[in-house]
Amino acid sequence: MASGCTYDFIVVGSGSSGGVVAGLLQRAGAKCLLIEAGKHFTASTFPANEADYSAQMFWGGGLEYDTRCLMGFLRGKCVGGGSIVNQALQDRFDDIALGDWKAQSGIDYFTPEAMDPFYTAAEDGIVLQTLPAEQRNRSAQLFIRGLDHAEVGWAALRRGQCDCGVEQGNDCIACLGGCHRDSKQSTLIAYIDPAMPKGLDLAAEFLVDRVEHSASGVKVHGHNGSGPKTYEAKKCILAGGSFGTTQILLKSGFRDKLPALGKCFSMHPQYMSFAEFDEPVDAHKGAFQTVKSSDKGLRKKGYKLENVYAPPVSIAMLYRRGGVDLQRFMKRYRYYACVEVAVRDEATGELSIDRKGKLLIKKEITAQDAARRDDGLELVRSVFAAVGAKSMFQSPMYFGLHLMGGCAIGVDPRTSVVNEAFQVHGCENLYTADTSIFPNAPGINPALSVMALAHKLSRQLVKG
């Protein structure tokens, strides 16, 4: 894998988009290079604790912040990207999400029927399990009871996993730093590892600075520990997600040609509330996140509730106090249940860069976002009260895990960055089909839909 070698395809980013695209192109016989800024971990080398994996497997050493330092963003930085550090939840977008995309983008294939073959292909490429009732810990049971009391619908979650061993005493919360059992169906497991022995080249710990497009191909300029390098390919697929792909295009000078570049950023802002109980809840034990709210009324209102938790360091950060107060709070770690409000936010954020190329994130919580948040938090309080919570605490910190937009897809280059064929407008050899192309927030976990889009793009590229 020498600098200057010409590939059929270069894929930048190895998460739910890039990992899938690279694996599928290799299967089709293409000469392909997969570039990833993070390290190449395996089940035996994932960091053993929260402090180490936060520092080593996420951009910003764990968290990135907006320009006002009011909200934090989590973004995986390792081979496999976010698919390594997420909870492997796999949901299709509904007709509401796809209908809104179709209306804003002007693209006809954003319907459940047209996307079905690509969703099916994505689902067939991994092992899926719907979590059974016997794997619900006490936190999930309390959540269900509270939702039932509030007459809010709920459903079991479906995850990409094959052998978590919960019945043997394994705790899935550890997989937020990578799955040590290779059960989680990350792109590393499902696509990248199988493709590498068959010819897929991998350049890990390589940071792309800019891309240079021409009619004959694309040059990818970047650097690693050995210094600057340039790779060349006939075609390049940017798959760095909302932040990564947008930043590369901004640093490559595309903003002058594409005024929509950096616009339409959204992130499903998430607000975590805790309830203390007299008896241990042990929300960190067993299967992590087994049920969700599934309610047409909440969908219409623009938010959902999720039964989540976090490891100790993250919980301490969410408390946002120190000294004796923090010690007292953390001593009760086993006694808390947590419910999160995830808002389907307006795509009003903007991504830009400073003179040194550093990413700048501007995101306001709009009046509509705030109204949805407040309605959700009020519902959470009633859910906790219904199941006998001793006290309640809402974290003042909020954050985004689903980073979307910046390179919106659409038919009009004045209001979008990527066309219906996933090409950057005016660049026939430069593509993207990751979360950066989302024209607005779907209000649903994006992982499976990104994989479906990756399958659609891959079929198109293979056909030529």
Task: Put a short name on every predicted segment.
Residues Q56-F58, C69-P112, E123, Q129-G153, ...:
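Dinucleotide-binding Rossmann-like beta1-alpha1 core, especially the glycine-rich loop
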Residues M1-W101, P112-E113, G222, K257-E276, ...:
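N-terminal glycine-rich phosphate/pyrophosphate-binding loop and immediately adjacent elements
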Residues L258-L377, H425, T432, S436-P439:
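FAD cofactor-binding and catalytic pocket of flavoenzymes
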Residues L34-I35, L202-A203, T432-A433:
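Short hydrophobic beta-strand that contains or immediately precedes a catalytic carboxylate
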Residues D108-V208, Y398, H402, G406-A408:
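Conserved redox-cofactor binding core of oxidoreductases
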Residues N440-R459:
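A conserved FAD-binding loop/helix module that cradles the flavin
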Residues L24-R27, K39-F41, P197, F206, ...:
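Glycine-rich loop(s) and the adjacent beta-strand/alpha-helix scaffold that form part
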